[in-house]
Every structure is written in C-alpha cells, then in structure tokens.
Amino acid sequence: MSRKTVSRTFSSFSISVVAVAVASTFSAHAGKFNPKFLEDVQGVGQHVDLTMFEKGQEQQLPGIYRVSVYVNEQRMETRTLEFKEATEAQRKAMGESLVPCLSRTQLAEMGVRVESFPALNLVSAEACVPFDEIIPLASSHFDFSEQKLVLSFPQAAMHQVARGTVPESLWDEGIPALLLDYSFSGSNSEYDSTGSSSSYVDDNGTVHHDDGKDTLKSDSYYLNLRSGLNLGAWRLRNYSTWSHSGGKAQWDNIGTSLSRAIIPFKAQLTMGDTATAGDIFDSVQMRGAMLASDEEMLPDSQRGFAPIVRGIAKSNAEVSIEQNGYVIYRTYVQPGAFEINDLYPTANSGDLTVIIKEADGSEQRFI
C-alpha cells in the first residue's frame, strides 16, 4: 500500500516537471509559420514573406489606414493616411513598428510651424518627411486596435491659437442691406405783436379802428440723416442734415465714406470723408484714404500689451502663471520648448511667477 502511494506521488511529480519544461521551451521561442502552406497544391503560388509577423504581436503591415488623428491630445479629424515600417532608430526612440507618412502640407494643416524648420522645406510639399527626426521631441503613436494616431509636438513648434480666437473661416461679411438712421425735430409758434391804435374814415364815410395787434407765425424743422449701404465686404456711409427756418430750406452733406475690412492685415480701409483716431492726439478731419488697425478683429487676449512667456518642459507639464499671489493663467504643454503669448493685459503691477509642474510632480519656478 505504501509503495503504490509513493509511486503515484513520484509519477505526478514527473509529469509536472515535463509540463513545465515544455511550457518554458514554448515561450522561449518565437512562433513561426511555414509559408509553404499558403502556396497552391502544385507549388506554383507566389512566395509569401511572413517575417513581418515574427517580430512580435504588435507588428502590423504597412499600408493605408483610416484613422482618427489626435494632435497634442486634441482630436483634429479623421483622415486616410499611409503608414510605413519604422526604421531601427524610430523603433528605439518611439517603440513603434509603423510611422505615419506625413507631408509638409499635412503638418501645416495640423498647426505645425513648418517655416521654423528649414529641413522640412528641403523636400516637396507632398513628400513624406521624417518629422520626428527634424522636430526635436516630436513623436507618433499608432493605436491599431482603435485606429487612432496620436501625434505629439513641442508647444513651441505649433502655431498658437490665442484664447477667444474665432477662426477666419467662420467670419461672415453679412448680407446686402440698406440702412437708414434719422432724427427729426420741429416747432410751430405764433405770437401777437402790439402797436399803437389808430382810426381812419374811408371814402364812403365808414370809420375804421386799428387796435395795433398783429399775429406772427414761425416754423422751424431739422432732420439728421445717417444712411448706408452694405454690399459684400464694402460699407458705404453718408451723413447729411436738412433744416428749414424762416421760409428757407438748406441741405448739407457732411460726409460720405466707403470702407471695407482687410482681414490679412486686421485693418480697415476707409476712403472719402473720415477722421483720424483720437486716442493720443486730437482727431483730425480729412478727405482721402486711410488704412488703420482694427482691434475688433483681434481676440480679447491680443488687445493691449502683455509679456510673452517662454520656457522648457521636461515632460507633459502643467504651466501656471501667478501675479501677486493669484493664478492668472494655466495651461498644459507637451515636452520641449513652449511659448505663451495669449495673456490678458492687466493693469496690476507685480512680477509674473511661472510654475512648471512636471508629470513626476517636480516643479520649476522662475520670474
């Protein structure tokens, strides 16, 4: 009885050792598939290269994929992109097997400041560029299971969109319209004048008496007229007045002007009767043409003066700006150099303290 028990125990132990050894051997070698199985029966089929799939489970074939594009954690759009096999250097730097084929035009559409990197201009606008090698700390990650491409660029390499900005593509010139703004006032008055009384006899012997009272009437009218015409981007304006007094009428044309917005310059072009701005010196009436900046085209954060803050983040970081102990600005930046140029102008005095809080919890402070 004792022998059987010992024998069973020994047998079970032997099987376990063999099973572990087999499992260890299986996991230590990469799986291979004989491509001969994919050829036809007569052996004349094309040779199939499966070495791509022997590099790991994350390996995917290069090709064209429709993906959702995220730039610095912000979803941009869904588009069809070509993906190429990553080079050995790209595999080591980003751990990616596929990298997107992005042209200079596509990078510009995503907000990258391509003009700041001369190497990007050495190739044609539609050719693939190794942006991760040209732009420091730029990277890409392709999530194949979710068909999502995540691109990361240093904040300083991106065009900054100031807070409150409305894209110019959404600006509207308005509808054609005829405008009329008027103000009218008038008065009627009557009064009696008293003179000396008199009497006289006419040829018929009738006696007439004059009590010396006369009734006087006075009418006065005034019209202030501001009219205009909107047609496309053009604005026609006229300012005129009309007055009537003492039986006489007078029409005065004070001024007529034609203006339109010049969007690339964020300015207004005015021709005709106009006046200079009176912000610093007295306003001067003039007749001619004037091109002047229009702050209404700028977001609130771009009106007035505010300093530009520059720094370098070591990781995905939170950047806060304090003044007199109060946080007046906070944003999040990618690794690399960053630039903050959309601070709201403030009338308060005091130094600005910049606090960079890294992903590991460490902080940098500078004034």
From Swiss-Prot:
GO terms for cellular component: cell outer membrane. Induction: Induced during the exponential growth phase. Gene3D superfamilies: 2.60.40.3110, 3.10.20.410. It holds the Pfam family Usher. InterPro entries: Fimb_usher (IPR000015), Fimbrial_membr_usher_CS (IPR018030), PapC_N (IPR025885), PapC_N_sf (IPR037224). It is a multi-pass membrane protein. Keywords: Cell outer membrane, Fimbrium biogenesis, Membrane, Signal, Transmembrane, Transport. Part of the lpfABCC'DE fimbrial operon. LP fimbriae may participate in the interaction with eukaryotic cells by assisting in microcolony formation. Could be involved in the export and assembly of the fimbrial subunits across the outer membrane. This is Probable outer membrane usher protein LpfC. It comes from Escherichia coli O157:H7. The gene is lpfC.
